[in-house]
């Protein structure tokens, strides 16, 4: 079993990297790939860089070069659903773009022409994440839609606009839809597991700086449990 894990920033990958045995590292086109072993499973850890272009380029390299069995995209996110708090974890049911608009040509808001409006996470991986989360009793774990855009969501007007477009949205961030889109094109199963570093629109820039490390700890904890339980 070959498992790929993608995080955008150093803070989002460093804990998992330290857990890998026999680790080797290489950089391709500015993307950092670390291969190693955790719980007798081969793991490819990708530090993709921030934003959709970086995520798409690095995920393409990952899938073409390493051909993993499945992909987990992890790291931090901004909470959107009213039930969520900083530190909570969101498991994706599906992933969408929140900054794509070709509705004038009768596409759904967020839909890239020629592709589905929503990239649906693999059911088995969602179940694996949910079952692994049962071992974590001090963090709320939710399941729902995650949306991606190339902007940090601290503008209340933008938050209100996205909330209107996606009323049941759980979290926002800057890479997952690009990762999911590439996985869709390659036919590779994926799931997104994100911990909340902030609540979108509510002094989110201050909260992000304060709670990024906590979010990374929580999301990595769940990812490690998922890898351990993978058959």
From Swiss-Prot:
Keywords: Amino-acid biosynthesis, Hydrolase, Methionine biosynthesis. Gene3D superfamilies: Nucleoside phosphorylase domain (3.40.50.1580). It catalyses: S-adenosyl-L-homocysteine + H2O = S-(5-deoxy-D-ribos-5-yl)-L-homocysteine + adenine; S-methyl-5'-thioadenosine + H2O = 5-(methylsulfanyl)-D-ribose + adenine; 5'-deoxyadenosine + H2O = 5-deoxy-D-ribose + adenine. One of its GO terms (biological process) is L-methionine salvage from S-adenosylmethionine. Substrate binds at residues 78, 153, 174-175. One of its GO terms (cellular component) is cytosol. The keyword Hydrolase applies. GO terms for molecular function: adenosylhomocysteine nucleosidase activity; methylthioadenosine nucleosidase activity. It is an enzyme of class 3 (hydrolase). It comes from the Bacteria. It holds the Pfam family PNP_UDP_1. The active site is at 12 (proton acceptor), 198 (proton donor). Pathway: Amino-acid biosynthesis; L-methionine biosynthesis via salvage pathway; S-methyl-5-thio-alpha-D-ribose 1-phosphate from S-methyl-5'-thioadenosine (hydrolase route): step 1/2. Its EC number is 3.2.2.9. NCBIfam families: MTA_SAH-Nsdase, PRK05584.1. Belongs to the PNP/UDP phosphorylase family. MtnN subfamily. Catalyzes the irreversible cleavage of the glycosidic bond in both 5'-methylthioadenosine (MTA) and S-adenosylhomocysteine (SAH/AdoHcy) to adenine and the corresponding thioribose, 5'-methylthioribose and S-ribosylhomocysteine, respectively. Also cleaves 5'-deoxyadenosine, a toxic by-product of radical S-adenosylmethionine (SAM) enzymes, into 5-deoxyribose and adenine. PANTHER family: 5'-METHYLTHIOADENOSINE/S-ADENOSYLHOMOCYSTEINE NUCLEOSIDASE, 5'-METHYLTHIOADENOSINE_S-ADENOSYLHOMOCYSTEINE NUCLEOSIDASE. This is 5'-methylthioadenosine/S-adenosylhomocysteine nucleosidase. It comes from Bacillus pumilus (strain SAFR-032). The gene is mtnN.
